[in-house]
Amino acid sequence: PGAVYLGVVHRLDRPTSGVIVFARTSKALPRLNKSFAERQTKKTYWAVVKNSPPKDSDTLTHFLKRNPKQNKSYANTKEVPDSKKAILHYHILKKMQRYVALEILLETGRHHQIRAQLASINCPIKGDLKYGFDRSNKDGSIHLHARKLSFMHPVKKEEMTITAPVPEDV
């Protein structure tokens, strides 16, 4: 009954799989947008990367500068003009023969943040040609998965956690 509403709360990079949240009412959308903008959400990603990072777990802090012509972000260790601070925390889930699986907790949500920051420590994501992996995946995806998203329900004020299953081909 009545009009149907669906508002986009956040986005994922095109080749990324996983959780995405939509608001079902026009009242919920600005509330959810605010919780994302104020970093009141907890975002967990899984990635398969080429090399083992220097530490089994760490916090990466960079200043990302976006190049719109290339649709790419560059990670800098020091602040540069027009850059934005980017913070993520990672730990190793599993070491495989050729790859390493990481769990990433995203503190900020910048353009291509995980991709740029992991590439900056010589850990490009499997299939991600743009950020230094040597070959693409057959389907054009990258091995970056938005695994879990926790946030406060915009009306009920209860914590919600949504977990996305891992794609079968991973």
PLM regions with names:
Residues 1-170:
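RNA pseudouridine synthases
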